[in-house]
Amino acid sequence: MADTQTKLSKTFSNFFASEKTSGILLILCTILSLSIANSLAGPAYQGFWHAIVAGLSIEHWVNDALMAVFFLFVGLELERELYNGELSNFRNALLPIFAAIGGIGVPALIHYTLNVGTPTQAGTGIPMATDIAFALGVLALLGSRVPASLKVFLTALAVMDDLGAIIVIAMFYTQQFSLVYLLSALAVFGLLLVLNRIFRVMSLLPYLLGGALMWFLMLKSGVHATIAGVLLAFAIPFSAKADDEKSPSHRLEHFLHKPVAFIILPIFALANTGIVIGSEWQHELLTPNSLGIIGGLVFGKPLGIALLSFVTVAIGVCRLPDDLKWTHIVGAGILGGIGFTMSIFITNLAFTNNASIINASKMAILMASVAAGGLGFLWLSFFQQNDNQ
């Protein structure tokens, strides 16, 4: 684990340093969006996001274009972790991988069980995801009171969670499908791989231009266009040397970090958390869909993460890092229930053109994420304080 932390020290510390501020900014944007949506300016606020620009609403541009940049950033993070980070050592990678599988499977099972055979069964993917910015933002509030390896574990877990969410989006949330456009997008991806692997083109420009074309073709194919961001990340040249500043992947990740944290995600929060809280909000939170979301995020996440982690360590498949205790793993599992932006993103795909279900789902996500963040903070604070006594 020491080697892993040494490898990650510079990049990871820079990444983690701004998560506290980013998390606070997301909270402020959410409060602002909720306040405006439930004021006299609410209709105008909703009308702004639904205004059509170049054939798509502003909300669609945010969710399809800006979030593709977010997924590009997530893909670059994942690539770094696979090459020289927490996931580069197979044995180190196994624990967050199995934890992520549990954190995806149990919440999905809870939602599916409550909604099977109904239209809201489409929301099974909603409680699968973890909001990296919010989860690490809450953990950052604890500062040095938690072990550094817990921050690394939660980062790897959240990245694997989002990878699972990306796969779910590609497989289950594709509406109309065009094989010609999809094959064309994959052909562009193949061409970018050739530029990287064979011709060793190190300039970012051809990759960014190819990525823009791939995004357009993905959009036309019916597969969600954000997938292009992840594919582009793995097509961009990466150096196996930790923190190699000449690496195109490293340079792009470094460039995107602050725009993603302080521009893209806050805009996404403003566009997607304008939840209208009506007089029937208590009833809406008691529907099978809302209960599945809340149950999946608040209870399913920590249960799945902790249970599968414990089983795999008990049978000798994985190893618990020396400075981590099971209370830390449970705490990370609770924080994994902060679905927020990622869960809202999947909600918009699951219930297209059904505003009432989308609004109720967002309310459930918001409540579950607040509960998970608060419980996770209190849990880790309590046990860390006891450990230090």
Swiss-Prot record:
One annotated GO biological process: regulation of pH
A GO CC term assigned to this protein in UniProt: plasma membrane
Membrane topology field: Multi-pass membrane protein
Reaction equations catalysed: Na(+)(in) + 2 H(+)(out) = Na(+)(out) + 2 H(+)(in)
Main location: membrane
GO MF entry, a single one: sodium:proton antiporter activity
Keywords for the protein's UniProt record, in alphabetical order: Antiport, Cell inner membrane, Cell membrane, Ion transport, Membrane, Sodium, Sodium transport, Transmembrane, Transmembrane helix, Transport
Keyword Transmembrane helix: yes
Membrane-spanning segments: 24-44, 56-76, 94-114, 122-142, 152-172, 176-196, 216-236, 259-279, 291-311, 326-346, 363-383
Subcellular location: Cell inner membrane
Sequence similarity: Belongs to the NhaA Na(+)/H(+) (TC 2.A.33) antiporter family.
HAMAP family: NhaA (MF_01844)
Function: Na(+)/H(+) antiporter that extrudes sodium in exchange for external protons.
Name used for this protein in its record: Na(+)/H(+) antiporter NhaA
Organism expressing this protein natively: Dechloromonas aromatica (strain RCB)
